[in-house]
């Protein structure tokens, strides 16, 4: 039996989904939106110069959703979201990645939160793994959200005022759009730069714990490694706009990478020297990694109840930290130390200046 519709007082949402060569994903996303307990929203699917367009797929949902399809030349995701913002009619503009599935009470939870916090102009929500995801997808999801990795830093805690949402699950009020001018860069940390600038304008942001989306991320470890390495490079790009934003905690994955790389020579040195104290030192050097690895295994097992996911989760977490650490380190050396290249990909669009004394969020 379908869940009865919930009515919200005076709030209309515009859902904006940038899309590039992923017609199957948009079908699943739109299908999940048809089951929402709150249906007072429009959907804008913006095809970003795809070779495999999803026009027919989107059209098939016109009798179940207030949905519009747009095709434009390729500008990548940041400016594609701006394209959607410019055409949205809602009071709130919600951005999802095309590889997300939306639980049926998503807008119900968001609407209730916004009713209780009318001063909030920006929000984000966490992500989780859907039961239908593959073991690799579940392991990747666990690695990205675990307290034992950078997930504990990125968004495992509720913050009211200064939370920095990510664009796979983010909402902004019309006021926030008008004040900020949208995305300044189109890729390589565009969502973090946007979130930081919104807060710098004095707008209040919040994490809504109940506003969960099921985020597929990547389907194999090779794709995941490339994606996370790019995240590390993007952090250096953000430094260009917010010089103080690259903090010691962002270097933790790089330190993890250096630690792992040092274990090999340390182990070989212990074998060559064949000294009791050296051997003991070598064994102790491995203890932190072994403890962390085992803790991740049992954390994943307790959370998912799946042995295969538990075996894959430490591998995913190790890949996440080493790839991010390498991306950050290599980009920092190339851009900041050696000055061999610009960190920006594409154009930087003009946006309204940040006031010198903005109101505190």
Question: Locations of the language-model features?
Answer:
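Glycine-rich, basic loop-to-helix element that forms the pyrophosphate-binding segment
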Residues: 72-88, 109, 160, 167
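Catalytic donor/gating beta->alpha subdomain of glycosyltransferases that bind UDP-sugars
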Residues: 184-246
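A conserved acidic beta->alpha catalytic loop
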Residues: 32, 39, 47-56, 74, ...
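Cell-envelope/extracellular polymer assembly enzymes that use nucleotide-activated donors
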Residues: 11-14, 42, 193
């Amino acid at each position: 039996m379908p869940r009865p519709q919930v009515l919200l007082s005076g709030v209309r949402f515009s859902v904006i989904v940038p899309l590039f060569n992923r017609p199957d994903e948009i079908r699943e996303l739109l299908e999940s939106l048809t089951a929402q307990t709150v249906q007072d929203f429009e959907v804008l699917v913006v095809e970003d110069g795809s070779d495999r367009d999803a026009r027919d797929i989107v059209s098939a949902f016109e009798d179940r959703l207030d949905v519009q399809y747009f095709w434009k030349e390729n500008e990548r995701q940041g400016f594609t979201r701006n394209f959607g913002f410019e055409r949205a009619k809602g009071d709130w503009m919600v951005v999802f990645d095309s590889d997300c599935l939306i639980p049926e009470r998503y807008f119900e939870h968001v609407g209730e939160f916004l009713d209780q916090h009318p001063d909030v102009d920006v929000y984000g929500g966490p992500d989780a793994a859907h039961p239908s995801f593959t073991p690799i997808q579940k392991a990747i999801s666990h690695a990205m959200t675990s307290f034992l990795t950078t997930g504990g830093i990125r968004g495992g805690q509720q913050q009211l005022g200064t939370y920095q949402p990510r664009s796979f699950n983010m909402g902004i009020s019309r006021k926030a759009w008008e004040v900020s001018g949208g995305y300044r860069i189109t890729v390589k940390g565009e969502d973090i730069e946007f979130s930081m600038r919104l807060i710098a304008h004095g707008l209040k942001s919040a994490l809504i714990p109940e506003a969960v989306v099921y985020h597929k991320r990547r389907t194999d470890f090779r794709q995941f490694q490339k994606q996370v390495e790019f995240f590390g490079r993007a952090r250096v790009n953000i430094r260009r706009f917010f010089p103080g934003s690259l903090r010691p905690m962002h270097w933790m994955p790089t330190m993890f990478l250096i630690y792992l790389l040092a274990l090999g020579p340390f182990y070989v040195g212990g074998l060559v020297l064949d000294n009791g104290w050296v051997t003991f030192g070598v064994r102790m050097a491995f203890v932190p990694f072994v403890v962390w690895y085992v803790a991740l295994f049992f954390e994943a097992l307790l959370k998912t109840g799946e042995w295969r996911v538990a075996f894959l989760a430490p591998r995913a977490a190790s890949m996440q930290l080493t790839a991010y650490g390498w991306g950050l380190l290599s980009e920092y050396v190339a851009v900041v130390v050696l000055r061999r290249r610009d960190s920006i990909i594409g154009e930087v669009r003009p946006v309204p200046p940040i006031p010198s004394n903005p109101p505190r969020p």
